[in-house]
Amino acid sequence: MTSMIPTARYRPVVRIGNWFEDICLEQEKVQAFKSLRDRGQLLVEKTRRLFDNFHKAIELEAPKENVYFGAIVQLMPMKMNICEEHVKAQPALSVIINERVVRHSQNINDECEITIAPSVTPCVRNSFRIVSGDEKDRTNEVIKYGQQFRLECVESQDDMLLLYSAPKSADLKSMIYTTFDSRKWGEINLPLGLCRKSNCGPGKEIPSAYTKWFCTHIEPKKRFESHGSPVPSNTALVITHVPTNKNLAAENVVVQTLFGPEFLVSVQNYKDIYNRERWQNIWMICNGQSEGKR
């Protein structure tokens, strides 16, 4: 029975043609690979360049008692109340880039997202410069409780990249695109993003108020009397978003990024039964000291 089944038979010239076509396709792949390599467009080279740009070492402000405008600092949650083990690398607010963006950009840009990542050493992705919130040059002035400020990426040159958040629209959607999101009681929290200063202001895409923040005392009973006093560095405090009146929050949500597992961050209020902020809303502004006042 098997001998009666017809089998495909090709003439030698047809087989040679097929082999030649396969060889041409392989040569075309090799030429495309060499062309991408010569232009530095290989994904492995882009990834290597990305890590070099994001992990470029940054020198923080010299340790001082208070926080000053113009200083390069890190924003660190006082405690990630997740496990009892002591973690050597203190987590810090950081910038990440997703797989979609890395193919056309390997630098910090307005398409990057914000997370909380382990900070072994200060670098470009986890350090920010504190600038005035009223368009005035207040460099070397002490920041006070209740005074508005902005957080600028240290790699910003001509067009500053500012940290911002935005309230939801009428359909409860956010204007900030993020790969992951966190929720409180089923509702999506407000995410953080980066925007260029040229896109902020009257008639622009993003109102300038969305980029403004201020600090308050960790104790609710002391906020009235501490308003207007200098903000101490490396000390527990609450960072509040001006237009939404919600606090910067470290979320107990782990996601996988190009840099490894990291925690999400949002703008949301977390309070206990005594109306005091929980660990998610407690931060410190680190200006170079290895350990904060705990």
Model-predicted segments: where are they?
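Lectin-like carbohydrate-binding module/patch detector with strong preference for beta-trefoil
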Residues: 1-294
